[in-house]
A protein has these predicted regions:
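Short beta-strand element of the alpha/beta-hydrolase
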Residues: 25-35
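Alpha/beta-hydrolase active-site loop
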Residues: 77-99
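Conserved alpha/beta-hydrolase
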Residues: 47-72
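C-terminal catalytic histidine-bearing segment of alpha/beta-hydrolase fold enzymes
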Residues: 207-210, 214-253
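N-terminal cap/lid segment of alpha/beta-hydrolase-fold proteins
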Residues: 1-24
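Primarily recognizes the serine-hydrolase "nucleophile elbow" in alpha/beta-hydrolase
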Residues: 92-149
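The feature captures the conserved acid-bearing segment of alpha/beta-hydrolase catalytic domains
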Residues: 152-202
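The serine-hydrolase catalytic nucleophile loop
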Residues: 36-48
Length: 253
């Protein structure tokens, strides 16, 4: 039987999803990050699939989302949220390590904003064993430049990309950029998926990152999957593929 528990880890609301017979065992653990304006509840079906395949799923509410929502979002909070996810990731993992519920088989998966988070986690945490990024982006600087003339700016005041604005935000964006230091993938298993017709988190930027790294030794376990005619939406086949990928790399290796 699959059990879902509400927990709070140092003021981070989470759902933990695991098979009942595994709840007190040391098993592979995956942190699942929802997308923009989503919540931990949006990932329950995915967490259940992970649990059925021998993993523990941790589903946090990200900053300004779910139980942590304080007001309506305007889009400019994106990188603050991803930066906070990076700060909180070792806290979430550490809580389970203290209880001897996870060893080195630690994974992360994210959708859209969560997929961007997954890339940032690969940059910062060598202990992350395997990762899945679904319709994410590994290059915050290029994404930020693109977003200024994209659908992200609908109903928002125009922003001029001045040198002063660039000086203010570029260091923070670079600190989250796996594209700047792709060698930090370091041979780890990474699955990347994107819908070709995605206009909200552009396919082209993500595919360009993959093309840049695919023949490098450090990326020998990076797998790319794309689905034609799919917009900003994760297909069930992509979810199935990501569950199988994490099962193979975290449970069966």
């Amino acid at each position: 039987m699959i059990i879902i528990q509400e927990k709070n880890i140092e003021q981070i609301p989470i759902l933990e999803i695991v098979q009942e017979e595994n709840k007190d065992k040391m098993i592979p653990t995956v942190v699942c990050y929802h997308g923009w304006t989503g919540s931990k509840e949006n990932c329950i079906h995915y967490g259940a699939m992970l649990a059925k395949n021998g993993m523990r799923a941790i589903l946090p509410d990200q900053l300004y989302h779910g139980e942590r929502k304080t007001s309506e979002l305007n889009g400019f909070e994106l990188w603050e949220i991803i930066g906070q996810n990076v700060k909180e990731f070792p806290t979430l993992v550490g809580a389970y390590q203290k209880e001897n519920l996870v060893d080195n088989k630690i994974g992360a998966i994210g959708f859209s904003m969560g997929g961007m988070t997954t890339y940032a986690l690969l940059k910062h945490f060598p202990f992350l064993y395997a990762a899945v990024s679904l319709m994410g982006n590994a290059d915050p600087v290029e994404f930020a430049k693109w977003s200024l003339t994209s659908t992200w700016m609908e109903d928002k005041p125009a922003v001029e990309l001045t040198p002063e604005l660039m000086d203010k935000y570029i260091p923070m964006l670079q600190s989250l950029s796996l594209a700047d230091t792709p060698e930090k993938i370091a041979g780890r298993p990474v699955l990347i998926w994107h819908g070709v017709e995605d206009k909200k988190v552009p396919y082209a930027l993500n595919h360009a990152f993959y093309e840049k790294i695919k023949d490098e030794p450090y990326a020998n376990r990076v797998k790319w999957i794309e689905t034609p005619d799919v917009p900003h939406f994760v297909t069930f086949k992509a979810i199935e593929a990501s569950v199988e990928f994490l099962k193979q790399t975290l449970v069966e290796e």
